[in-house]
Structure formats: structure tokens, C-alpha cells
Amino acid sequence: MSVDTYTETTKIDKLLKKPTSHFQLSTTQLYNKILDNNEGVLTELGAVNASTGKYTGRSPKDKFFVSEPSYRDNIDWGEINQPIDEETFLKLYHKVLDYLDKKDELYVFKGYAGSDKDTMLKLTVINELAWHNLFAKNMFIRPESKEEATKIKPNFTIVSAPHFKADPEVDGTKSETFVIISFKHKVILIGGTEYAGEMKKGIFSVMNYLLPMQDIMSMHCSANVGEKGDVALFFGLSGTGKTTLSADPHRKLIGDDEHGWNKNGVFNIEGGCYAKAINLSKEKEPQIFDAIKYGAILENTVVAEDGSVDFEDNRYTENTRAAYPINHIDNIVVPSKAAHPNTIIFLTADAFGVIPPISKLNKDQAMYHFLSGFTSKLAGTERGVTEPEPSFSTCFGAPFFPLHPTVYADLLGELIDLHDVDVYLVNTGWTGGKYGVGRRISLHYTRQMVNQAISGKLKNAEYTKDSTFGLSIPVKIEDVPKTILNPINAWSDKEKYKAQAEDLIQRFEKNFEKFGEKVEHIAEKGSFNK
């Protein structure tokens, strides 16, 4: 053990043994601390609402991985996975530990990430704020008892000091905020931001490194299971309908965001859900609304003096959130794991209006679309700007994957082959024209298409290959108008459709160039018109 490692271990032990380090507090005890410390307010729903200050989302430009000899050759360095040297990290780490040692109170939670016992990550979370500790308790997997928690020897420790501000010139960061992951020292160091999601996504990034090293697929997706044990995975970026479509009263939820896929099947990495709360209503999303009760946390929502919550008010951010234990949802699998997937759904919201509402992908096409991670952003719509912008996020979650994207794509391809998984690309975006001209595909029709896919009814259906993209489109789907299945038929001007489709194909190809020679085999067989 090096001197630095010895010192940091001693400092961590000292923090954990402080009389004012509150260990494994109950929800009620944490509520009392949150309210006594003015960290949040109680709402009429029973949840507490906390403000995250000026950072109402993640700070991807302030996230670093420590460049350490045993790990540096594995990480896909670049704008997303930024390096920081070990010496710089250790100096900052010790400063943060010394800072926390001077705090009147700290909050400690021990738990797990990963509901599969063989690959479960044991965690210690040290928080400056009580509400962050409740967040950790809600989002990670909770031990059965306090006694069990005392026996946990962590594989990874989160040290969270949101009120500690870094000095970039001295500390080697880019701003006052930092999220630094060290695989050698097995720590996630967070400072300068009160956005609690950094803890959740930090551990997800760690699992996205560790699991593939054991030939286990890690995935940014939601998952559910039917009465017959049939499992479906939903991949999709923000705004594609992932949460809405995977919340099905006839299917049990495995998890809403982070999963692994090993030799036994699919398992949830988390013990909670972190749902978007903007415009939330009981009518639209009853499962999520009913989960916001005693024990849950709301982030950055607007709360009146009488405790009522206005979910439509976005004065602080569009990114309002609700964090709650998964057992706040009635319709769940316990424990949070199931068999191998039967169906994978890739969701995209195509604002260009040219991708079919549903198409069946072969393995190569699935790998291509997984690496592309396409959806559309509607930039500047509040000013009447109607030009959609394509958005590509590798693996449907580029900020969270430290290894080269082909590691994940190759694993996915192998698993699709091994378990004969049906993969569908579902467009929840526009038809009959691009945004501003066409119309949004009806949620009712999308649900019907997804339900037919998951039920297996589309497995051996009749398909036609569209001439533009080379995608396999079902000839008919029960209760869905035939006219919308092939997008060219929904456009009155066929030449405009072809021009728009060709433009999108070129954008896909340009995006794929960033992967270089490593993905030539995927582009060769999986891209459009192949």
C-alpha cells in the first residue's frame, strides 16, 4: 500500500468513525435532518423538495477519469472521457477529505449497485448533505438491515462535497465543479455541484467499465417483463417515449434506466427510479405520480406555501426530477432481474419525418443503430425556428460509457445472436412531413406497434423492404393504418420525402465516420440500404 493510499484510507476511516457521521439513517431520520437543516421542504404529496442551486443537470465537461497505468489503455479518451493525472486527483481528494473532516455533520450510506449477486458492487456513500444521502438510499440497492450494512466492505466509495468549490488554477479542474472517477483508488469524488444525479451516473459509468470486462453487457435502457416471463428492453434518448412506453400496466417493471445482461439474463443496476417530473400528471403517468410520496425526493419543482406542487412550472429548470425507491411502484419484479430479452426496442423521435414508425432490424442493423443512437432535437422552437437538428449519442447514452463503443456494440451483437432476440426500430416522431409540416405519430398507434412487437406477433409477419433506407417494414399491423407504415406513403410530395431521407442518411454516415476503422464491419453490413 502506497503512502497516499494509506493516508486516504486513514482519512476515510476517520470520517466514518466521527461521532457526527450519521450512519445508515432511516428515511424518517433523514427527513428530520433535511427539514431541520433547511435543505428542503415537505410537500403535500409527502415527498421532500430540494433545490440543486445553479446546477440543475449533470456537468459533463467537468467529469474526469484518473489516468492510471492499469486502466488508461482501456478507456476511450476524448471530449467525453477526459483524463486527469493521478497526482492532481490525489491532491484534490485529500483537500476534500480534510474539508469534510471539519463539517459538523456527515451522512453515510452503505449499499449495492447491481441486483446480480455475482457482479454486485458494494458501495459506501459519504455525503455533506442529508438530502443527498436520502437520494443515495433511494437510488442504490438497500441492505436488508443496518447490521448487514455494517458488514459491507466497499468496492467503491462516493465522496460527495457539493459545497466544496475547486480552484481550477490550483486543482487542475475546468471549473469549481468536478466529478472524478478513479478505478485504482476505487472512488468517485464529487464537488461544486448539488445535482444529485452525478452520484447515480457516476456509479453507472463505473459499472459500464467493470461489467464489459467480465463479458457482461451494460445498458442505458428501461426493461419490463410480461406474465409469461417475456422480457423487453427499451433504448432511447430523452424525449423518445422510453419511460411512457415501458410503463405498462400489463407488464412488470425490472428497472427504468440502467441494466446489465449476463449469462443468466437481465438485471437492474439500481434500487430506485429517477424520473422526469416536468408536466407530470396522474392522468398521463399514474405509476410515476403515485410513487411520489413519503420517502421520495423532488428536485427543483415549484412548491407553494401550502405544500402543493406545480409540475408544469419550469422556472428553475425543465429538468425537474423525482427520485424514489423502486418499491414505490406496485408493478415490479422482486428482485429486479429476469430472463434473457425476447425483444429489444430502439426508440427514436425523427423530426425529419422519414424513418418508418416501426421496422425490424437484423443483427448488423441493430449494431449500427445502437452505435448511432439517433434522435432529433427541436432547436429554438420557442422562437418559431422549425428546423430539426439530428442528435447522435453512442449506445443511447454516450456520456456514461468509458470503453470504446465497439466493446458494447460487439457484446450486443453476440447476445442478439446467442438468444435469438428480435430488434425493432420505432420512430415516435413525425410522419407526413418534417416537424412543422407533418404530424406527430399517434401515441396510440405507437403503443399498438410496440405491443405487437413485444407479444411476438411481428416475429414472423410479412415484411417489405423500403427502397430508401433498406429497412424491413411490416406490411400490416392490427389497428394501425396501413398508410403510415411506409413513410413515403404519408408524404404528399414524394420527391421532397426522398430528398429529406437522403439528407438524413448522409448525416448518419458523417456521424459514423468518428468511429474510424474499428467499425467498418458494422457500417459495411448494417448501415442504410445494406
Curated annotation (Swiss-Prot):
Chain sites annotated for binding substrate: 58, 195, 201, 321
**What's a single GO BP term from this record?**
gluconeogenesis
Class of this enzyme: lyase
| EC code | 4.1.1.49
Identify the species of origin: Staphylococcus aureus (strain MSSA476)
Co-factor note (free text): Binds 1 Mn(2+) ion per subunit.
Q: Which SUPFAM superfamilies does UniProt cross-reference here?
A: PEP carboxykinase N-terminal domain, PEP carboxykinase-like
Q: Binding residues for ATP, per the UniProt record?
A: 201, 220, 236-244, 285, 321, 440-441, 446
Signal sequence segment: none
Q: Which key words are in the record?
A: ATP-binding, Cytoplasm, Decarboxylase, Gluconeogenesis, Lyase, Manganese, Metal-binding, Nucleotide-binding
Homology family = Belongs to the phosphoenolpyruvate carboxykinase (ATP) family.
User: What pathway does this protein act in?
Assistant: Carbohydrate biosynthesis; gluconeogenesis
The record lists the lineage as:
Bacteria, Bacillati, Bacillota, Bacilli, Bacillales
Q: Which reaction does it catalyse?
A: oxaloacetate + ATP = phosphoenolpyruvate + ADP + CO2
Which GO cellular component term is one of those annotated? cytosol
Gene Ontology molecular functions? ATP binding; metal ion binding; phosphoenolpyruvate carboxykinase (ATP) activity
InterPro entries membership = PEP_carboxykinase_ATP, PEP_carboxykinase_C, PEP_carboxykinase_N, PEPCK_ATP_CS
Its needed co-factors are: Mn(2+)
Q: What does this protein do?
A: Involved in the gluconeogenesis. Catalyzes the conversion of oxaloacetate (OAA) to phosphoenolpyruvate (PEP) through direct phosphoryl transfer between the nucleoside triphosphate and OAA.
Name listed for the protein in its UniProt record: Phosphoenolpyruvate carboxykinase (ATP)
Instruction: Give residues annotated as binding Mn(2+).
Output: 201, 220, 257
NCBIfam families xrefs: pckA, PRK09344.1-2, PRK09344.1-3
Q: Cellular location of this protein?
A: Cytoplasm
